[in-house]
Regions:
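Structural signature of tandem-repeat unit edges
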Residues: 22, 48-55, 76-89, 99-112, ...
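Consensus positions within tandem repeat domains that build extended binding/scaffold surfaces
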Residues: 91-94, 114-119, 137-140, 160-163, ...
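Bacterial N-terminal signal peptides
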Residues: 8-18
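Bacterial N-terminal signal peptides that target proteins for export
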Residues: 1-8
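LRR flanking "cap" motifs
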Residues: 32-89
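Sec-dependent signal peptide cleavage junction
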Residues: 18-28
Length: 218
């Protein structure tokens, strides 16, 4: 018995891969990964997509081109998203069609977000913006049908065209005092958005920014 224990311990020390079973760790294995621009990404077997590093994320294209995000071929495996502190920008089309992600917390290091960044993330119910974010792109949250509330951070001056269009379950939008412009289609077809308070600093509300029935209080 002593000899068996001795060799078992030697095996664990000599082969670190086996440590997960020796120490009881149950962390999920990385099944895909690589680099994108200055950043690194991994996708684990339990569906967690993690982006780490320092700097901006590149801009990508939609699913009909060769310039899609590197994790796009595995989009149906992604159930959770972790963006690491140090990432400064979320690129165009970065997380399009991540249909099983339910919540996203964007780190404080991110100051801007590209167009179509979270397009058609049908299960996304909540997104937390960092205080430092000053810009997000057109169509950024288009067709996020489960999104229920949005608190836009202070510092944002423009809500771009169709940014939250077709978010059918969106009921609450909190707008910052820094806001100046609400572009056309920003909240188009948000059928459950029934009342919005417009900050005093808003000087431009373009045609079709809100559903036609909406009663806006300024």
């Amino acid at each position: 018995m002593r000899r068996f224990l001795f060799w078992s311990l030697c095996f664990c020390l000599l082969f670190p891969v086996g440590l997960s079973s020796c120490d009881g760790s149950d962390s999920a294995a990385v099944i895909f990964g690589g680099t994108t621009g200055e950043l690194t990404w991994t996708l684990t077997e339990d569906g967690v997509l993690t982006i780490t590093g320092e700097g901006p994320m590149p801009d990508y294209r939609d699913g009909g081109t060769s310039e899609t995000p590197p994790w796009y071929p595995h989009v149906n495996r992604i159930s959770s998203l972790t963006i690491g502190e140090g990432v400064t920008r979320i690129g165009d089309y970065a997380f399009m069609l991540c249909s099983f992600v339910t919540e996203v917390v964007i780190p404080e290091s991110v100051t801007s977000m590209g167009d179509w960044a979270f397009w058609h993330c049908q299960s996304l119910k909540r997104i937390t913006f960092p205080d430092r974010m000053v810009r997000f792109g057109e169509w950024a949250f288009y067709e996020n049908e489960s999104l229920q509330s949005v608190c836009i951070p202070e510092g944002v001056t423009t809500i771009p065209s169709s940014a939250f269009a077709r978010c059918h379950n969106l009921t609450c939008v909190i707008m910052p005092g820094s806001l100046q412009t609400i572009c056309g289609g920003a909240f188009s077809q948000c059928h459950k958005l029934t009342d919005v308070t417009i900050p005093d600093g808003v000087t431009v509300i373009e045609t079709g920014a809100f559903p036609s029935y909406l009663d806006m209080a300024g």
